Each structure stands twice: as structure tokens, then as C-alpha cells.
Amino acid sequence: MMSKINQTDIDRLIELVGGRGNIATVSHCITRLRFVLNQPANARPKEIEQLPMVKGCFTNAGQFQVVIGTNVGDYYQALIASTGQAQVDKEQVKKAARHNMKWHEQLISHFAVIFFPLLPALISGGLILGFRNVIGDLPMSNGQTLAQMYPSLQTIYDFLWLIGEAIFFYLPVGICWSAVKKMGGTPILGIVLGVTLVSPQLMNAYLLGQQLPEVWDFGMFSIAKVGYQAQVIPALLAGLALGVIETRLKRIVPDYLYLVVVPVCSLILAVFLAHALIGPFGRMIGDGVAFAVRHLMTGSFAPIGAALFGFLYAPLVITGVHQTTLAIDLQMIQSMGGTPVWPLIALSNIAQGSAVIGIIISSRKHNEREISVPAAISAWLGVTEPAMYGINLKYRFPMLCAMIGSGLAGLLCGLNGVMANGIGVGGLPGILSIQPSYWQVFALAMAIAIIIPIVLTSFIYQRKYRLGTLDIV
């Protein structure tokens, strides 16, 4: 494979990204070279896209990314050999890329880093609860559930709650661990802090308002013994506070006193602040977010809110703001037992892939299918960046067609109050996360998200081709 690589193309790529001196670091993923450039403005993307091995390029998260294809590893090795760059891992690249980010991009990046390690558990929990609802909560034709009809399934239904409860009920433990780790603190202290937020000594958060909690009486003031089960924002703020406290203490406490002073003082202060100030404040924020989303997505404004979110979600992905929707989903699951947001995200994934299908059907451009076919499949499975950056944004109108299809599908979901058990896989498999009573409506919404973008994209492509106005950004 290395012999098939034209060294002239490699040298030209180096020149077009600004030369060897402009490359801070370079790594690669499955299909893309990921450059961190000292001066991003010196790169010439339009000329780079003319290179024979390049299928597209874009800037995201402070990285200049060049789409090569599945043989990107060979090009990476040739590039490393030509530039003399040392091979780096993804974390080193991300750290270097932050220098090219604006403050709000860095904030979103930090937010994503905290929640990303939790995704395997959260996705598993969403799918497990979905399967549990199918066997235990969905009435069959005789009015009974499968668990009622078959005792063995009732056992499975009860057993699966052990996993579902562990993931969502004790979610603050994972959030505190990840937040403290991100801040450079000791992860095990984050776990301990998280456990203190969901300890059996505390009144269950779901009973708040139904009964009076006990208190810790400190004389001049008291603190209610209330837990933060399944709460996102209190756990996030508490974890960040512990990380800040510990890292600051490390700087001023001598090494020989570290184990005696830093962990103990950090934990006591963080746990006290978590229950006295941070937790109640975070609960207020979380309740406010839940109130706003509930009225926008489930009240009389639901059709409008769902349609707008479905239409605008793809642009949120481009800006990176979509990372914040994870916390909203988790907050809704805690307060409502499900989320109306995740179904709209899954539909947006489908619509982006469908717009690419419209291009595949209409276009006969040389080598385009090498990126369009994998991009469409990827989007239908929940990862939309290859579809958006590789095809839809290049032509521009497929992006709008996908947004229209997603908005109309969202409108249908809003009209019918579609809810998901939790976050899960996106795209077509996203139906597995939907509460079973909404499967038929969601299947129809999926059909809208597939058909509308394909038809609109194909029609506009062919019309522009006939008029000679088809252009690529």
C-alpha cells in the first residue's frame, strides 16, 4: 500500500497546510488526518481538496481534518516520515488543539470530555430499560404483558432493573469520578464524593416534597439529609469543586504531608459544600432546565419546540453545542422518567444520512461514492460528521433538505409526545431507545426523515444540474 502513495501528493499536502513549521501535531482516526496547526489561517482547504487522495477537509474542535479514506494510516506514516513529526496519541492532539479554540469552544470541549466516558454505561442503560419495558410494560393483544404471561420473563424483568438502577440511580458517582479526573484530581476521591450524594443515609430525592427530611444540626445552621439520586448538575458542580479544591491544595501542601492533608481536607470540604450549597443550587438549576424543556417539548408548545429542535440540531452539531444536550436528556430522565429530546436527535441523524442517499442516487461524480456511501451508513447508525462535512455542507442544499426532513419528523413526535427511555444509539437503531408505546409513531417519523431528504435532495440536485448552477463549496 505504501508503494501506491505518491510522494509528490504528500509534499503538496504539507505545503498546502502551511508547511512543516505550521504543523504542531498530526494524528489520524479511521478515515481522517487530524492536524493541529500553529496558524490555521495559512491552510488552503480548496486547493487541498483538489489533491487526488483527498475527499474533503474541514475544521472542527481546533483541528484541521483532511478526509482520506480507510487507507489513511498509510498516508499518515508517509506524512510522519516526510515531516519528522513524532507520533502522538489523541489526548495530546486534543490538548494541543485547545490553543486554537475560542473560550466557548473550550467550555464545550471540557463538558464533552466529562460526559464521554459515561456513554457506554448510559447507552447500555437506555437499551436495557427499553427491552425491560417491552417485556414488562407493553400490553399484548390479551391485555397482559409478556412478563405476566411468562413467569420466567418476570424474573428477567426484575433482574434488568438491577442494572438500570445502578446506571441511572447512581449516575452522580460516575459524573463526580469523571469531573474530578478531568480537573486533574484523584478519581477515587470523585467516586467517594459521588457515593456521598446517593448514600442510603440520605432521603431519596424522589421523596422530596412528600416528606420532611432529617437534618444535620451544626448549631448555627442545619443541612437537610437529602440525596441527589440521578441528578446531573449537582453532581457535575460538586465534582468540579472537588477537583479545584484538591489541585489547589496540592500546590501549597508539602509532599511529605500530602496523604495526610490533601485527600482528607479535600473530601470534607467538598462533601460539606456539596450538601450545603452546591447541591441545592444545582438542583434548582436542574429543575429550571427540566421545567423549560418540559414546557417546550411536552406542553402546548411541544409541536413547535420539537420541530425547531429537529430543524436546528444539525447546526448545533457543527458548532459543538450539541454536547450539552446530553445533560438535558439525563435531567429529563430524572424528572420525567423519559426524554423527548433523544428521539429528535436520532431522527436528525437519519435525515443527514438520507440527504447523502439523495446525492448518491443523483450524482455520478468520480470517486464521490468512496466517501458518500460510508458517510450515509455512518449517519444512519448515529454518527453524522462524515455525512455533514464530507457531502452535505459541500453542496449546501442537502444540509437544508436534511434539516427540513428532521424538522417535519420532529413535528410529528411533538404532536404525539414521543419519549425515549434514555439516551442510546442514534440513527435507525435509535428506535430501540424509544418507549414501546410510541414505536408506531416513531417509525412513521423515521420514514419522514428518510423520504423527505432523499426526495428533496434528488430533485434539487437534478434541477441545479440541468440549469448548470450546481456548485460545491
Swiss-Prot record:
Keywords (A to Z) from UniProt = Cell inner membrane, Cell membrane, Kinase, Membrane, Phosphoprotein, Phosphotransferase system, Sugar transport, Transferase, Transmembrane, Transmembrane helix, Transport
Q: So which domain of life are we looking at? A: Bacteria
Q: Which residues are annotated with the PTM Phosphocysteine?
A: 29
Q: Does the record carry Oxidoreductase as a key word?
A: no
Transmembrane annotation, as ranges: 111-131, 159-179, 188-208, 226-246, 259-279, 301-321, 341-361, 371-391, 399-419, 441-461
Name the GO terms of the biological process aspect: phosphoenolpyruvate-dependent sugar phosphotransferase system; trehalose transport
Primary location class: membrane
SUPFAM superfamilies per record: Glucose permease domain IIB (SSF55604)
Can you say where in the cell this protein is located? Answer: Cell inner membrane
Name the job this protein performs.
Answer: The phosphoenolpyruvate-dependent sugar phosphotransferase system (sugar PTS), a major carbohydrate active transport system, catalyzes the phosphorylation of incoming sugar substrates concomitantly with their translocation across the cell membrane. This system is involved in trehalose transport at low osmolarity.
More about this protein: E.coli does not possess a trehalose-specific phosphotransferase enzyme IIA component, however it seems that it use the glucose-specific phosphotransferase enzyme IIA component to delivers trehalose-6-phosphate into the cell.
Q: State what protein this is by name.
A: PTS system trehalose-specific EIIBC component
User: What is the protein's species of origin?
Assistant: Escherichia coli (strain K12)
